[in-house]
Amino acid sequence: MGLEKSLILFPLLVLVLGWVQPSLARESPAMKFERQHMDSDGASSSSSTYCNQMMKRREMTKESCKPVNTFVHEPLADVQAVCSQENVTCKNGKQNCYKSTSALHITDCRLKDNSKYPNCDYKTSQYQKHIIVACEGNPYVPVHFDATV
Protein backbone atom coordinates (compact mmCIF):
# COMPACT_ATOMS: atom_id res chain seq x y z
CA MET A 1 0.00 0.00 0.00
CA GLY A 2 2.81 2.45 0.87
CA LEU A 3 4.57 1.79 -2.45
CA GLU A 4 1.36 2.47 -4.40
CA LYS A 5 0.94 5.83 -2.65
CA SER A 6 4.56 6.70 -3.40
CA LEU A 7 4.11 5.85 -7.08
CA ILE A 8 1.09 8.16 -7.23
CA LEU A 9 2.49 11.00 -5.09
CA PHE A 10 5.96 11.18 -6.68
CA PRO A 11 4.74 12.23 -10.16
CA LEU A 12 2.46 14.81 -8.50
CA LEU A 13 5.40 16.17 -6.54
CA VAL A 14 7.47 16.45 -9.73
CA LEU A 15 4.62 18.32 -11.45
CA VAL A 16 4.19 20.75 -8.55
CA LEU A 17 7.93 21.43 -8.29
CA GLY A 18 8.15 21.97 -12.04
CA TRP A 19 5.38 24.52 -11.79
CA VAL A 20 6.64 26.31 -8.65
CA GLN A 21 10.40 26.38 -9.27
CA PRO A 22 10.46 28.79 -12.25
CA SER A 23 8.55 31.38 -10.22
CA LEU A 24 11.07 31.00 -7.38
CA ALA A 25 13.94 31.61 -9.79
CA ARG A 26 12.42 34.82 -11.21
CA GLU A 27 14.17 37.99 -10.12
CA SER A 28 11.93 40.39 -8.21
CA PRO A 29 12.08 44.11 -9.08
CA ALA A 30 13.85 44.76 -5.74
CA MET A 31 16.43 42.05 -6.47
CA LYS A 32 16.98 43.47 -9.96
CA PHE A 33 17.53 46.94 -8.44
CA GLU A 34 20.15 45.50 -6.08
CA ARG A 35 21.92 43.62 -8.88
CA GLN A 36 21.98 46.60 -11.22
CA HIS A 37 22.64 49.46 -8.80
CA MET A 38 24.12 48.37 -5.47
CA ASP A 39 27.87 48.06 -4.86
CA SER A 40 28.21 48.84 -1.17
CA ASP A 41 31.94 48.21 -0.85
CA GLY A 42 32.79 49.85 -4.20
CA ALA A 43 36.48 49.49 -3.37
CA SER A 44 37.67 49.54 -6.99
CA SER A 45 35.18 52.11 -8.31
CA SER A 46 38.00 54.59 -8.95
CA SER A 47 39.48 52.32 -11.63
CA SER A 48 38.82 53.41 -15.22
CA THR A 49 37.75 49.82 -16.00
CA TYR A 50 35.26 49.63 -13.11
CA CYS A 51 32.17 50.12 -15.29
CA ASN A 52 33.32 47.66 -17.96
CA GLN A 53 33.90 45.02 -15.28
CA MET A 54 30.76 45.68 -13.24
CA MET A 55 28.37 46.02 -16.18
CA LYS A 56 29.53 42.63 -17.45
CA ARG A 57 29.59 40.99 -14.00
CA ARG A 58 26.08 42.24 -13.22
CA GLU A 59 24.75 40.95 -16.57
CA MET A 60 23.92 44.29 -18.19
CA THR A 61 25.85 43.53 -21.38
CA LYS A 62 24.41 40.05 -22.06
CA GLU A 63 22.20 40.75 -25.09
CA SER A 64 23.03 44.41 -25.71
CA CYS A 65 25.01 47.23 -24.11
CA LYS A 66 22.92 49.04 -21.47
CA PRO A 67 23.57 52.71 -22.36
CA VAL A 68 23.60 54.21 -18.84
CA ASN A 69 23.75 52.78 -15.32
CA THR A 70 24.51 54.10 -11.85
CA PHE A 71 26.07 52.13 -8.99
CA VAL A 72 25.54 53.32 -5.41
CA HIS A 73 28.39 52.81 -2.94
CA GLU A 74 26.42 52.99 0.31
CA PRO A 75 24.92 50.32 2.59
CA LEU A 76 21.72 48.79 1.20
CA ALA A 77 19.80 49.91 4.31
CA ASP A 78 20.75 53.55 3.58
CA VAL A 79 19.46 53.28 0.01
CA GLN A 80 16.27 51.52 1.17
CA ALA A 81 15.76 54.38 3.66
CA VAL A 82 15.44 56.80 0.72
CA CYS A 83 11.94 55.34 0.23
CA SER A 84 10.84 57.25 3.35
CA GLN A 85 12.54 60.53 2.44
CA GLU A 86 11.41 63.38 0.14
CA ASN A 87 8.62 62.31 -2.23
CA VAL A 88 9.17 63.64 -5.78
CA THR A 89 7.59 63.03 -9.18
CA CYS A 90 9.32 60.36 -11.28
CA LYS A 91 10.49 61.05 -14.84
CA ASN A 92 7.52 58.98 -16.09
CA GLY A 93 5.06 61.15 -14.12
CA LYS A 94 4.35 58.60 -11.38
CA GLN A 95 4.34 59.71 -7.75
CA ASN A 96 6.34 56.85 -6.18
CA CYS A 97 9.82 58.40 -6.42
CA TYR A 98 11.91 59.58 -3.49
CA LYS A 99 14.98 61.80 -3.29
CA SER A 100 17.77 61.11 -0.81
CA THR A 101 18.19 63.81 1.83
CA SER A 102 21.98 63.58 1.57
CA ALA A 103 24.44 63.16 -1.28
CA LEU A 104 25.59 59.55 -1.75
CA HIS A 105 28.74 58.06 -3.29
CA ILE A 106 27.89 56.85 -6.80
CA THR A 107 29.60 55.73 -9.99
CA ASP A 108 28.02 56.72 -13.28
CA CYS A 109 28.61 54.35 -16.23
CA ARG A 110 27.95 55.70 -19.73
CA LEU A 111 28.44 53.79 -22.94
CA LYS A 112 31.11 55.45 -25.09
CA ASP A 113 29.93 56.73 -28.50
CA ASN A 114 32.13 54.37 -30.52
CA SER A 115 31.23 51.29 -28.46
CA LYS A 116 29.35 48.43 -30.15
CA TYR A 117 27.93 45.19 -28.74
CA PRO A 118 29.43 42.74 -27.75
CA ASN A 119 32.43 44.98 -26.92
CA CYS A 120 30.63 47.30 -24.52
CA ASP A 121 33.00 50.06 -23.41
CA TYR A 122 31.97 52.46 -20.65
CA LYS A 123 33.17 55.79 -19.28
CA THR A 124 33.48 55.61 -15.48
CA SER A 125 32.72 58.77 -13.45
CA GLN A 126 32.48 59.08 -9.67
CA TYR A 127 30.24 61.60 -7.93
CA GLN A 128 28.57 62.48 -4.66
CA LYS A 129 24.97 63.28 -5.57
CA HIS A 130 21.43 62.92 -4.33
CA ILE A 131 19.66 59.93 -5.86
CA ILE A 132 16.03 59.54 -6.90
CA VAL A 133 14.55 56.04 -6.76
CA ALA A 134 11.10 54.60 -7.41
CA CYS A 135 9.80 52.47 -4.54
CA GLU A 136 7.17 49.74 -4.39
CA GLY A 137 6.06 46.76 -2.36
CA ASN A 138 5.69 45.71 1.23
CA PRO A 139 8.24 46.41 2.59
CA TYR A 140 8.51 49.59 0.52
CA VAL A 141 11.89 49.26 -1.25
CA PRO A 142 13.68 50.70 -4.31
CA VAL A 143 12.75 49.02 -7.60
CA HIS A 144 13.99 51.59 -10.14
CA PHE A 145 16.85 54.09 -10.29
CA ASP A 146 15.27 57.25 -11.70
CA ALA A 147 17.91 60.00 -11.56
CA THR A 148 20.69 61.83 -9.75
CA VAL A 149 20.66 65.51 -8.76
UniProtKB/Swiss-Prot annotation:
Record-level GO cellular component terms: extracellular region
Keyword terms, alphabetized: Disulfide bond, Endonuclease, Hydrolase, Lyase, Nuclease, Secreted, Signal
Disulfide bridge positions per record: C51-C109, C65-C120, C83-C135, C90-C97
Top-level division of the source organism's lineage: Eukaryota
GO terms under biological process: defense response to Gram-positive bacterium
Main localization of the protein described in the UniProt heading: secreted
Localization, UniProt: Secreted
Gene3D superfamilies given in the database record: Ribonuclease A-like domain (3.10.130.10)
SUPFAM superfamilies on file: RNase A-like
This protein's record includes keyword Nuclease: yes
Pfam families documented for this protein: RnaseA
Sequence similarity: Belongs to the pancreatic ribonuclease family.
Protein name: Ribonuclease pancreatic
Lineage: Eukaryota, Metazoa, Chordata, Craniata, Vertebrata
